[in-house]
C-alpha cells in the first residue's frame, strides 16, 4: 500500500482488473520493509523507536516480543460508592441544575506551605476560643484576590502598588461573614507580602494562554492556542450592519424588559384593587349586620359603589332665566340615621378660569367676526394702496375705478320712460327745474336723465350730441352716432369654419368644491363685506350729490328771483329733444 490516501472511486475512473495468477509473489521481508500499516500518528512521531518496534512486530505476527511501554495501572483505595451513595432523585421541572461549578466547589483558593506556616503561627498567638479555621483563612485570602482582580485587572502589566487595607475593608459586603472580618487585618499583611514577592501577580494558579500576536508552539504549558483562520475582510458596510443589528437587538430587549415591568406594575395594581374591594365588601357586610341588629331602616346606597357625579356645565344666557323643573325628591330619612355622603369635587387646575369668569360663545364669535372684518378692511386698504396710479379692469376689482363722467362736449341722449313729471311732484319743483335751465349747464342733463341714472354705466352704445355756438351767434348741434362694429372682409369659406367654433367645450372637467370649506366661506365673507362697503359708499355719494343739488338750487333761486316759465320746452318733449336758447 502506498503512503498516500487512495482517492474516492468514481464512475468515470478506469480501474484495472488483475487476476490471481497475474499478481507477482513478493518476498515477505521486502513487504515488511514497506509501510503497509497506517500508524495513525503524526509523520514526525513515526520514527520513535518503540513505535517502530511495535509496528514491525505486528507485521511479522510477533506481538509479544515488542510493545509500547506505558505506566502501570494503579487501583485507587477510595470507595466512591460509600462516599457518594446513589440517592439522586430526578426533579420534576425542566431546570435540572442552575448552579455553576464555581458555586458548587466552594472557595477556589487552596492553602500553600507558606500559608500553612503563617496559619499555625497566627493560631498559636491566639486563644483556643478565638482561633481561625483553614476554611475561613482560605475565604479571606480569596476575597483579597478577587477584590484585587476587580480593581486592578492589569496589575501584572502596569505593576501598580498593592491595594491598601482601607480599600479592602470598603469592599467587604454581606458575602464575608462577621466572624471572619476580625482576622482580615492580620491575614492582609501576609497576603501583601506574598503579593509583593510575586510582582503583584495573582496568587491563584490560572491557565496559561497565548499572549501577543506571535504563537509559541514550543511552550508545552500553553493551554489554549489561537486557531489559524484567515481573517475576514471587514468593510464599513459590515461594521455598520453589525452595529445596526446590535442596536436593534438592544432595543428589542429593552422593549421586552419594559413590557414585563409594565405588566408587573399592572398586575400589582390589580392585586391591590382586588384586596381593597374585598376589604370594602367585608366592611359593608359588617355595616349591614350592624344595621340589622340595631333595626335601622335605611336604603342600601352606602353598600354599593356610587357613580362619580360630574360638574354641570354652565347654561347660556338664553336658558339661564328659564324656571327649573321641580324634581321629585325621594323620601328622606331622619337626620340622625341618614349618613352624610362625601362630596366629590374636581380640583381646579392652576392657570384655568373659574366658571363665573368663562366667556360666552356669542362674545367669542363676535370677536372672531370683528377680527375677520378688520383683516378684510386691512387687505382692501393694502390693495388700494398697491393700485395707486393703475386702472384695475378685473372682473371684481378690490379698488373700484373712478366713476365715469360725461364729457363736457358730447352728452348722451337717453330715452326716458316717463316724459311727463310724476303726479307727486308739485308745480314748485317744475318751476325750480325750469329756472335751472339757464343758470346751470348741467340742468339740461338733469331733465333728460332720471334721478336713478347711475354715472358708471357704459355710454359708448348711446348716441350723443354736442351744442356749440358758431360765427354770428349761430347755434350748431353736432351728432355722434353709436360706434359700429369693425367690418373685416373675410372669405365666406373661412368664415364658415368659425361658425361652430366655440372657446368653451363640453369636455371641460368639472371641479367639485365643498360649499362649507373654510377657504370658500372666507371668500364669500370677503365678497359680502366688499359689496356692503360699495353699497354704503354709493349711498353716501348719492346723498352728497342730492344735497349739493339742493344747495345750488337754493342759491340760484335767491340770486335770480322767480323762475322764467317762458323758456320751458313744453310739457311733453320728444325723446332726444334738445333745448335751444337764442
UniProtKB/Swiss-Prot annotation:
Principal localisation: nucleus
Residue ranges of coiled coil: 238-295, 352-385
Alphabetized, the UniProt keywords read:
Cell cycle, Coiled coil, DNA damage, DNA repair, Nucleus, Transcription, Transcription regulation
- Any one GO cellular component localisation term in the record: nucleus
Query: What Pfam families does the entry give?
Result: EPL1
Gene Ontology biological-process entries:
DNA repair; regulation of transcription by RNA polymerase II
Query: Biased-composition ranges for Low complexity?
Result: 539-555
Subcellular location as annotated: Nucleus
Instruction: Specify where the region named Disordered lies, as residue ranges.
Output: 323-351, 539-582
Q: Enumerate the InterPro entries for this protein.
A: Enhancer_polycomb, Enhancer_polycomb-like_N
Question: What task does this protein carry out?
Answer: Component of the NuA4 histone acetyltransferase complex which is involved in transcriptional activation of selected genes principally by acetylation of nucleosomal histone H4 and H2A. The NuA4 complex is also involved in DNA repair. Involved in gene silencing by neighboring heterochromatin, blockage of the silencing spreading along the chromosome, and required for cell cycle progression through G2/M.
- Subunit and interaction comment: Component of the NuA4 histone acetyltransferase complex.
Record family assignment = Belongs to the enhancer of polycomb family.
Q: What is this protein called?
A: Enhancer of polycomb-like protein 1
Query: What is the organism field in this record?
Result: Aspergillus fumigatus (strain ATCC MYA-4609 / CBS 101355 / FGSC A1100 / Af293) (Neosartorya fumigata)
Amino acid at each position: 500500500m502506498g503512503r498516500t490516501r487512495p482517492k474516492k472511486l468514481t464512475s468515470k475512473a478506469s480501474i484495472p482488473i488483475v487476476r490471481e495468477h497475474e499478481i507477482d509473489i513478493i518476498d515477505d521481508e521486502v513487504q515488511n520493509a514497506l509501510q503497509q500499516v497506517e500508524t495513525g500518528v503524526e509523520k514526525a512521531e513515526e520514527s520513535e523507536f518503540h513505535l517502530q518496534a511495535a509496528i514491525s512486530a505486528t507485521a511479522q505476527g510477533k506481538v509479544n516480543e515488542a510493545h509500547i511501554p506505558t505506566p502501570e495501572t494503579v487501583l485507587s483505595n477510595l470507595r466512591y460508592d460509600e462516599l457518594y451513595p446513589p440517592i439522586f432523585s430526578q426533579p420534576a421541572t425542566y431546570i435540572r441544575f442552575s448552579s455553576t461549578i464555581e458555586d458548587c466547589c466552594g472557595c477556589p483558593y487552596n492553602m500553600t506551605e507558606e500559608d500553612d506556616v503563617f496559619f499555625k503561627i497566627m493560631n498559636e498567638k491566639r486563644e483556643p476560643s478565638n482561633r481561625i479555621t483553614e476554611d475561613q483563612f482560605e475565604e479571606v485570602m480569596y476575597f483579597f484576590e478577587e477584590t484585587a482582580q476587580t480593581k486592578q485587572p492589569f496589575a501584572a502589566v502596569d505593576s501598580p502598588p498593592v491595594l491598601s487595607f482601607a480599600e479592602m475593608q470598603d469592599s467587604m459586603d454581606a458575602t464575608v461573614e462577621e466572624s471572619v472580618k476580625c482576622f482580615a487585618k492580620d491575614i492582609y499583611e501576609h497576603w501583601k507580602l506574598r503579593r509583593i514577592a510575586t510582582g503583584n501577580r495573582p496568587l491563584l494558579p490560572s491557565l496559561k494562554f497565548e499572549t501577543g500576536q506571535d504563537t509559541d508552539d514550543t511552550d508545552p504549558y500553553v493551554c489554549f492556542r489561537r486557531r489559524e483562520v484567515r481573517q475576514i475582510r471587514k468593510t464599513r458596510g459590515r461594521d455598520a450592519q453589525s452595529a445596526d443589528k446590535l442596536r436593534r437587538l438592544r432595543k428589542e430587549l429593552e422593549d421586552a424588559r419594559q413590557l414585563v415591568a409594565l405588566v408587573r406594575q399592572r398586575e400589582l395594581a390589580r392585586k391591590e384593587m382586588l384586596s381593597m374591594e374585598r376589604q370594602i365588601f367585608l366592611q359593608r357586610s359588617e355595616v349591614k349586620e350592624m344595621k340589622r341588629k340595631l333595626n335601622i331602616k335605611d336604603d342600601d346606597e352606602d353598600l354599593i359603589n356610587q357613580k362619580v357625579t360630574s360638574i354641570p356645565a354652565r347654561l347660556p344666557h338664553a336658558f339661564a332665566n328659564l324656571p327649573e323643573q321641580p324634581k321629585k325628591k325621594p323620601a328622606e330619612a331622619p337626620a340622625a340615621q341618614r349618613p352624610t355622603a362625601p362630596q366629590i369635587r374636581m380640583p381646579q387646575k392652576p392657570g384655568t378660569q373659574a366658571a363665573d369668569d368663562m366667556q360666552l360663545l356669542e362674545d367669542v364669535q363676535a370677536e372672531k367676526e370683528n377680527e375677520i372684518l378688520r383683516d378684510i378692511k386691512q387687505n382692501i386698504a393694502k390693495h388700494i394702496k398697491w393700485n395707486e396710479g393703475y386702472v384695475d379692469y378685473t372682473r371684481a376689482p378690490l379698488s373700484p375705478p373712478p366713476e365715469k363722467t360725461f364729457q363736457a362736449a358730447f352728452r348722451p341722449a337717453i330715452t326716458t320712460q316717463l316724459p311727463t313729471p310724476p303726479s307727486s311732484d308739485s308745480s314748485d319743483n317744475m318751476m325750480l327745474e325750469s329756472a335751472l335751465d339757464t343758470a346751470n349747464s348741467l340742468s339740461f342733463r338733469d331733465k333728460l336723465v332720471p334721478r336713478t341714472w347711475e354715472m358708471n354705466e357704459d355710454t359708448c352704445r348711446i348716441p350723443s350730441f354736442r351744442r356749440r355756438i358758431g360765427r354770428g351767434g349761430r347755434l350748431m348741434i353736432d351728432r355722434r352716432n353709436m360706434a359700429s362694429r369693425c367690418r373685416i372682409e373675410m372669405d365666406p369659406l373661412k368664415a364658415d369654419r368659425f361658425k361652430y367654433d366655440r372657446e368653451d367645450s363640453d369636455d371641460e372637467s368639472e371641479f367639485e368644491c365643498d360649499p362649507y370649506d373654510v377657504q370658500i366661506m372666507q371668500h364669500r365673507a370677503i365678497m359680502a363685506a366688499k359689496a356692503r362697503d360699495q353699497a354704503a359708499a354709493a349711498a353716501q355719494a348719492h346723498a352728497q350729490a342730492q344735497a349739493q343739488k339742493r344747495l345750488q338750487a337754493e342759491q340760484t333761486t335767491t340770486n335770480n328771483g322767480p323762475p322764467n316759465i317762458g323758456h320751458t320746452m313744453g310739457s311733453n318733449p320728444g325723446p332726444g329733444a334738445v333745448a335751444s336758447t337764442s
